[in-house]
Amino acid sequence: MTLRDLVDKLLGRQPASASTARDRLQLVLAHDRSDLSPELLDQMRREIFEVVAKYVDIDLEEGDVSLETEDRVTALVANLPFRRPITSAPPKSD
């Protein structure tokens, strides 16, 4: 999410159709370049949410994990709004 997207969201502005189309095309290209199946990407999202939720209280409804491409580089981007930190220590793994 760019700064402009954040400002537009805060002000309640709707994105222009050209901007929306460009964002969708970038998403399709990112998915294509990553060679990840939709099922694998969904599994990754669930697991990322589970791991982060061990340390902080996150808003799962507002959270998002996506692939973004910029300058021919594809990145996995997690946008997970925190509600509050979890004060107890995370469970130890075996």
UniProtKB/Swiss-Prot annotation:
Domain of life: Bacteria
Disulfide bonds: none
Keyword Cell cycle among UniProt keywords: yes
GO biological process, one term: regulation of division septum assembly
The entry's keywords: Cell cycle, Cell division
Alphabetical list of SUPFAM superfamilies matching this protein: Cell division protein MinE topological specificity domain
One protein family per Pfam: MinE
Purpose of the protein: Prevents the cell division inhibition by proteins MinC and MinD at internal division sites while permitting inhibition at polar sites. This ensures cell division at the proper site by restricting the formation of a division septum at the midpoint of the long axis of the cell.
NCBIfam families documented for this protein: minE, PRK00296.1
Family, similarity comment: Belongs to the MinE family.
The protein's name: Cell division topological specificity factor
Organism: Synechococcus sp. (strain CC9311)
Lineage: Bacteria, Bacillati, Cyanobacteriota, Cyanophyceae, Synechococcales
Gene giving rise to this polypeptide: minE
